[in-house]
Regions:
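Basic, amphipathic "hinge/linker" alpha-helix immediately C-terminal to the N-terminal HTH DNA-binding motif
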Residues: 115, 165-172
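Extended hydrophobic-aromatic, low-complexity segments
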Residues: 132-133, 144-145, 160
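Short, amphipathic alpha-helical interaction segments positioned at domain boundaries
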Residues: 172-196
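C-terminal scaffold of the Radical SAM
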Residues: 1-139, 195
């Protein structure tokens, strides 16, 4: 369980994110100093192009392969995957033996609230940030009304401008932690009770 940094700033989970952030700093500065553009926590591009400007919140994404995550409107699903070393080869073999890809066993239909949260997470974690006008057009409210954004701004992890909400350089380093703060209780319960 991820605890809010506002309620338990010295929780074990938060300290792990702090350690991850410290490990992240040196290579991040090295890449930036050498002209790379950071587009997400783990993605740096050396020759930015117009492809780097594409929004991260609305594309239809159909993933292929073992563990691929797909986003099709309000449907979110993934093919089976494992992180256990001794199970990886078997999972890939099972995937390669699949003949019917029209059936998914690991997915669900997102509620409007979950779609809103997904839009926030996907855009906030991307270097262009969240477009406020697009958010308001989709969800009928201003993202400035979300208390968590004010709390992240107080920590200087986001920059809230007239038209966008973007992670700061420090916030980008904590993006694994920040993204989890936006996960709904319903999704968190599904994650915690999922059995493989």
């Amino acid at each position: 369980m991820i605890y809010s940094f506002l309620n338990q700033p010295v929780s074990k989970e938060f300290l792990l994110f702090v350690r991850e952030r410290l490990v992240f700093d040196s290579p991040m500065h090295l890449l930036k100093d050498r002209g790379f553009l950071q587009t997400s926590m783990r993605r740096f591009i050396h020759h930015p192009s117009t492809d780097a400007e594409i929004s991260c919140g609305d594309e239809v994404m159909l993933s292929c392969g073992s563990g691929g995550r797909s986003y099709l409107g309000h449907l979110h699903y993934a093919t089976r995957y494992t992180v256990s070393q001794h199970c990886i080869a078997q999972e890939i073999d099972d995937y390669m033996g699949t003949t019917d890809f029209t059936i998914t066993r690991n997915g669900f239909i997102l509620s409007q609230e979950e779609r809103r949260q997904r839009f926030i997470i996907k855009n906030l974690m991307y270097y262009m940030g969240l477009d406020k006008a697009e958010y308001e057009r989709r969800f009928g409210e201003s993202p400035d009304d979300i208390p968590l954004f004010r709390q992240l701004a107080e920590r200087q992890w986001i920059e809230n401008t007239d038209d966008r909400i973007c992670l700061t350089s420090e916030g980008m380093g904590y993006s694994d932690y920040i993204g989890q703060l936006f996960i709904t209780p319903e999704i968190r319960e599904l994650m915690e009770t999922y059995s493989y």
